[in-house]
């Protein structure tokens, strides 16, 4: 998987730079998202792993995408097909999203709780995370009954576990040692 990250990075960077230059970040993110979904399709994945000529592969892929790709998007697909890189399209999308978030100084923050949080609670969490990370945050709320109570907050590789489940697990670790 880390090899996919390495392979995808230059394609994501090129697409991102082109999108910024042409003020088309939303359009490019949508094109990449659609292309990534197509690449994840089982039948397309089989086609990508088969012995199909790159030109035919690009034509088929572009035909499946239809009018979801503009000319520049089609060119990206052609280049990736020529280099046998279409299977990494989902990772290209992820890298593109990360580059965009860095440009916009935003970070995705996952907030996992046992119950739905109020707007006031969410705004307090957002304010605290913005202060801690020195960036704007976008909260992604998820409900997981296994946390019992409290919240688990994830931002990149940082995890703040304020859940009852987390406390019980830490207590069990202390008692076992």
Swiss-Prot record:
Bilayer topology: Peripheral membrane protein
Keywords carried by this UniProt record: ATP synthesis, Cell inner membrane, Cell membrane, CF(1), Hydrogen ion transport, Ion transport, Membrane, Transport
GO molecular function: proton-transporting ATP synthase activity, rotational mechanism
Pfam family, one: OSCP
GO CC annotations, alphabetized: plasma membrane; proton-transporting ATP synthase complex
Main localization (coarse): membrane
Localization in the cell: Cell inner membrane
Family statement: Belongs to the ATPase delta chain family.
Function: F(1)F(0) ATP synthase produces ATP from ADP in the presence of a proton or sodium gradient. F-type ATPases consist of two structural domains, F(1) containing the extramembraneous catalytic core and F(0) containing the membrane proton channel, linked together by a central stalk and a peripheral stalk. During catalysis, ATP synthesis in the catalytic domain of F(1) is coupled via a rotary mechanism of the central stalk subunits to proton translocation.
Assembly description: F-type ATPases have 2 components, F(1) - the catalytic core - and F(0) - the membrane proton channel. F(1) has five subunits: alpha(3), beta(3), gamma(1), delta(1), epsilon(1). F(0) has three main subunits: a(1), b(2) and c(10-14). The alpha and beta chains form an alternating ring which encloses part of the gamma chain. F(1) is attached to F(0) by a central stalk formed by the gamma and epsilon chains, while a peripheral stalk is formed by the delta and b chains.
PANTHER family the UniProt entry points to: ATP SYNTHASE DELTA CHAIN (PTHR11910)
Protein name: ATP synthase subunit delta
Protein species of origin: Pectobacterium carotovorum subsp. carotovorum (strain PC1)
């Amino acid at each position: 998987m880390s090899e996919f990250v390495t392979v995808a990075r230059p394609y994501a960077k090129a697409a991102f730079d082109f999108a910024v230059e042409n003020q088309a970040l939303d359009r490019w993110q949508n094109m990449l998202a659609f292309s990534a979904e197509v690449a994840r399709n089982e039948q397309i994945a089989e086609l990508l792993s088969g012995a199909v000529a790159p030109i035919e592969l690009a034509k088929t892929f572009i035909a499946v995408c239809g009018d979801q790709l503009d000319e520049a998007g089609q060119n990206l697909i052609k280049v990736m097909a020529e280099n046998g890189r279409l299977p990494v399209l989902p990772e290209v999308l992820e890298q593109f999203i990360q580059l965009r978030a860095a440009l916009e100084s935003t970070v995705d923050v996952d907030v996992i709780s046992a119950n739905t949080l109020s707007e006031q609670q969410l705004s307090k969490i957002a304010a605290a995370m913005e202060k801690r990370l020195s960036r704007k945050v976008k909260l992604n709320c998820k409900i997981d009954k296994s946390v019992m109570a409290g919240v688990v907050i994830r931002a990149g590789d940082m995890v703040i576990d304020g859940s009852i489940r987390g406390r019980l697990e830490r207590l069990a670790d202390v008692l076992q040692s």
